Amino acid sequence: MLKPMALITPITAMAFDYGTRRVGVAVGNSVTKAGEPLKTIAAPNSDTLFKDIEQLLAEWQPNQLVVGHPTHPDGAPHEMTAKAIRFGNQLHGRFQLPVAWVDERYTSAVLEGDAQMRDNLDAHSATLILEQYFSELDTNLNTKAAD
């Protein structure tokens, strides 16, 4: 018999597809489980990057941050793995918001063939990362409800 699920407070989340030249940003919520690409930040330095992020956080007021966790296809870390982890840790340290990590191995590859996505590829990748987060969140909640 399934246990009734407790009411869960909706989550507004902001996701990031981190890159050394550009950072894609998306926002969404756990009610619709959909993400919306916001922008791709091409900041010349980390101060400018975090200033842009601070403005987005003030506007959207998320209570959860999500960062793509890049790895090789076999799951092994590579040079961007440590950089993305550092970026996520900096987000947490600067803005005191929880950071969740989502496997982003194939997000850009899924979108690269779509001509409509090319102009804002990184923000659309962040959207896929965010939707994967909501999917995993759903799976975890359903597993707990069945226990």
UniProtKB/Swiss-Prot annotation:
Subcellular localization(s) per the UniProt record: Cytoplasm
NCBIfam families: RNAse_H_YqgF
A Pfam family reported for this protein in Swiss-Prot or TrEMBL: RuvX
UniProt protein name: Putative pre-16S rRNA nuclease
PANTHER family in the cross-refs: POLYNUCLEOTIDYL TRANSFERASE, RIBONUCLEASE H-LIKE SUPERFAMILY PROTEIN
Disulfide topology: none
GO biological process: rRNA 5'-end processing
EC number(s) on file: 3.1.-.-
Annotated GO CC locations: cytosol
Coiled coil: none
Role summary: Could be a nuclease involved in processing of the 5'-end of pre-16S rRNA.
Similarity remark: Belongs to the YqgF nuclease family.
Originating species: Polynucleobacter necessarius subsp. necessarius (strain STIR1)
Enzyme class of the recorded protein, top EC level: hydrolase
A GO MF term: nuclease activity
Keywords (A to Z) from UniProt: Cytoplasm, Hydrolase, Nuclease, Ribosome biogenesis
Listed InterPro entries: RNaseH-like_sf, YqgF, YqgF/RNaseH-like_dom, YqgF/RNaseH-like_dom_sf
High-level lineage: Bacteria, Pseudomonadati, Pseudomonadota, Betaproteobacteria, Burkholderiales
